[in-house]
């Protein structure tokens, strides 16, 4: 049977999310002079349906995606293809970052794709321990990958930041994620060259994740920062944050002890017959006793830390691309440290202010604590998960820091706090702030918890999902309709200014949406079908006006197979619920399609009385079973306007195109559909995340560089001899064993 026909039969309903996201290729494509580890030359992408590439395409589009880990389960017939979340516990966004660069600079020859994994020092540690030193091996724990001896991986799989310093010809490029130092990559070779700041410049998220009692500090500590730092090309400064907090709950720390107790009870109820066939192993007994004592010490120490409010901290960091980073601790006006309860996934920057936000991407420390991955513990783990888990905060707490306060002779700065109703993961700020008024563009992810993912424990053994594989690892879908907002804040008085109707909701009874917004129905009620799950965004860089006029958003839609009963119960009584929870259940079962739209933000001077500042002016709805993601604006060469390039998934990876395509739209006419679609039999994405565009690329010439050995040596010297030798053999020289035979080579 034709595979594409078979795929269409299985994916009749929009509620079937594309299974092509379940697999990803870890192959690196590139020129050997740029990347000696590249397995193949750059891919020349194919154009579908005999279409032509738009002649105005130019420059280079960069896309980032998590691509599994060195020990991810691979396909039987192709070891390069892995299934990162097949264990039923690991989210898609736990994995090595793969950089994809699409070159549109020579359209006569075609579009070429170069890829490379972002290989930080901890990557080489991960690769070497996996094959050569299993006692130090890294394992997946929730969003993180961790070794009990070496610490936390910095996987760099979320975002980019272009930086154009006035004294340099080419743009430089940072690669980022929420829990690791940003790294600069070479835009031509895609190599991860250097971190920003020395390891000792960055404070660990929590003392527990930097140093355990009676043990040396981890070589790789957990650092929480922002996946979206900012760059001011007018002043040549990059801004980001370094934040941390005390332990979120004491209950979470009981998980290992509870499992130990359950295991003891199980062994008493069901003693092994083999246990009576020989005398007890005294050495093994004392090892277990010592381990239990050590665990008790750790537990008591963790309890003390959970009550230490001074473990909460936020630093604003600035960097000029050449010298040591500068940092300032941010406090409330009363001098108390700021406590970020979730994350600082994104920050904003204006000409006079740094805007910080406690964003709705919750990071729970309890996710990383060890839990047995065994069927007999599934019910226990489900009970513990429901006990520990909590919904994201329903409001957006914002902290405003004046840039003129960031002086070299001070160590602390004061922030003013503003709270905006409804939660936010992504937001943008206008650069101009006339009269100290800051304009924020927010996508309210109402009851959409992107930090929750589909797990094996969410399903019963009898649930066969219609013969399709479960969407393990995928972010759960939205549980209420979303809202777009544009707000003006008075930075001096730290309050919101009411200037016009500036929030767009898809609930007709609340606010009649503009005429473009088509509807979906349930129980005779109509709702806008476009505003479900604002995921990722794109925009034209540096608008001359200094404020955003159009922002392109990809919306998730609703899908039955990424709906969980646990998530539904957690958000059933959501504070700002717009659509009754039972109706959301019905809408999700029916399915709401993914879409790409253009949100227009009107100038305040052009508005009439009671007119909404926000308007959906153009939109494209993807076909049933298709999911569009990661939009990027590309300016048109030699003219105005531009294009939107995005990733589109459909079907399964058994199709000739692996169910992965690159679609190109006219940015001024989304509704007419893609101008062309690109594909290749070897193009196999995981879930893509953020993007960027550069007009040109070039070999990195900046002198800033932090050597690996000098960066980590102060920590490695405190380690046992085994770990010191391990770093000398594998991490410092950036060596990666290809098979177990390489382990004996020194």
Q: For the regions a protein language model found, what residue spans apply to each?
A:
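Beta-propeller domains
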Residues: 1-746
């Amino acid at each position: 049977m034709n595979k594409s026909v078979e795929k269409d039969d299985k994916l009749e309903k929009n509620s079937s999310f594309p299974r092509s996201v379940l697999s990803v290729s870890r192959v690196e494509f590139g020129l050997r002079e740029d990347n000696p580890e590249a397995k193949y030359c750059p891919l020349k992408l194919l154009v579908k349906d005999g279409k032509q590439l738009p002649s105005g395409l130019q420059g280079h589009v960069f896309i980032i995606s998590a691509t599994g880990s060195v020990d991810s389960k691979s396909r039987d017939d192709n070891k390069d293809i892995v299934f990162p979340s097949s264990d039923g516990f690991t989210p898609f966004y736990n994995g090595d970052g793969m950089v994809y660069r699409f070159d549109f600079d020579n359209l006569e020859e075609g579009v070429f794709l170069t890829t490379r994994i972002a290989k930080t020092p901890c990557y080489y540690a991960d690769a070497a321990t996996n094959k050569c030193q299993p006692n130090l091996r890294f394992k997946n724990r929730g969003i993180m990958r961790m070794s009990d001896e070496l610490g936390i991986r910095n996987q760099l799989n979320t975002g980019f930041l272009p930086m154009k310093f006035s004294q340099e010809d080419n743009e430089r490029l940072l690669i980022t994620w929420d829990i690791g130092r940003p790294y600069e990559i070479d835009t031509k070779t895609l190599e991860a060259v250097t971190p920003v700041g020395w390891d000792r410049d960055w404070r660990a998220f929590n003392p527990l994740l930097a140093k355990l009692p009676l043990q040396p500090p981890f070589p790789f500590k957990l650092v929480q920062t922002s996946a979206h730092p900012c760059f001011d090309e007018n002043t040549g400064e990059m801004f980001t944050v370094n934040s941390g907090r005390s332990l979120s709950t004491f209950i979470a720390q009981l998980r290992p002890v509870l499992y130990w107790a359950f295991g003891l009870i199980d062994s008493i109820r069901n003693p092994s017959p083999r246990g009576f066939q020989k005398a007890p192993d005294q050495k093994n007994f004392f090892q277990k006793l010592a381990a239990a004592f050590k665990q008790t010490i750790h537990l008591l120490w963790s309890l003390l830390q959970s009550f230490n409010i001074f473990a909460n901290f936020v630093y604003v960091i600035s960097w000029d691309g050449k010298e040591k980073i500068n940092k300032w601790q941010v406090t409330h006006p009363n001098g108390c440290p700021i406590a970020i309860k979730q994350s600082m996934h994104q920050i904003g920057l204006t000409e006079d202010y740094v805007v910080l936000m406690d964003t709705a991407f919750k990071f729970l420390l309890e996710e990383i604590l060890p839990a047995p991955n065994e069927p007999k513990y599934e019910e226990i783990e489900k009970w513990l998960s429901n006990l520990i888990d909590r919904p994201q905060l329903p409001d957006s707490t914002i902290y405003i820091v004046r840039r003129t306060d960031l002086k070299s002779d001070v160590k602390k700065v004061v922030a003013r706090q503003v709270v905006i109703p409804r939660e936010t993961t992504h937001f943008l700020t206008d650069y101009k702030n006339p009269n100290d008024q800051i304009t924020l563009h927010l996508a309210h992810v109402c009851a959409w918890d992107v930090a929750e993912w589909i797990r094996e424990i969410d399903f019963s053994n009898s649930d066969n999902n219609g013969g399709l594989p479960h969407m393990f690892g995928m972010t759960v879908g939205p549980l209420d309709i979303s809202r777009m907002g544009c707000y003006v804040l008075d930075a001096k008085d730290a309050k919101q200014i009411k200037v016009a109707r500036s929030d767009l909701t898809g609930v007709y009874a609340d606010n009649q949406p503009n005429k473009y917004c088509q509807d979906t129905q349930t129980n005779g009620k109509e709702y806008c079908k476009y505003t479900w799950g604002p995921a990722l965004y794109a925009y034209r860089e540096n608008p001359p006006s200094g404020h955003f006029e159009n922002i392109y958003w990809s919306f998730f839609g609703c899908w039955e197979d990424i709906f969980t009963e646990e998530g539904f119960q957690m958000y059933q009584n959501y504070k700002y619920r717009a659509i009754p929870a039972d109706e959301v259940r019905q809408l999700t079962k029916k399915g709401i399609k993914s879409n790409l739209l253009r949100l227009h933000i009107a100038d305040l001077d052009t508005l009439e009385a009671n007119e909404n500042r926000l308007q959906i002016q153009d939109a494209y709805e993807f076909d049933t079973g298709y999911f569009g993601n990661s939009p990027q604006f590309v300016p048109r060469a030699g003219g105005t306007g531009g294009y939107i390039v995005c990733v589109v998934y459909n079907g399964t990876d058994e199709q000739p195109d692996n169910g992965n395509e690159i679609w190109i739209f006219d940015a001024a006419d989304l509704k007419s559909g893609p101008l062309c679609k690109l594909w290749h039999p070897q193009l196999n994405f995981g879930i893509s995340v953020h993007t960027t565009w550069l007009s040109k690329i070039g070999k990195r010439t900046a002198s800033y560089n932090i050597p690996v050995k000098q960066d980590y040596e102060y920590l490695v010297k405190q380690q046992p001899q085994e770990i010191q030798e391990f770093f000398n053999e594998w991490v410092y020289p950036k060596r990666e064993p290809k098979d177990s035979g390489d382990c004996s080579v020194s």
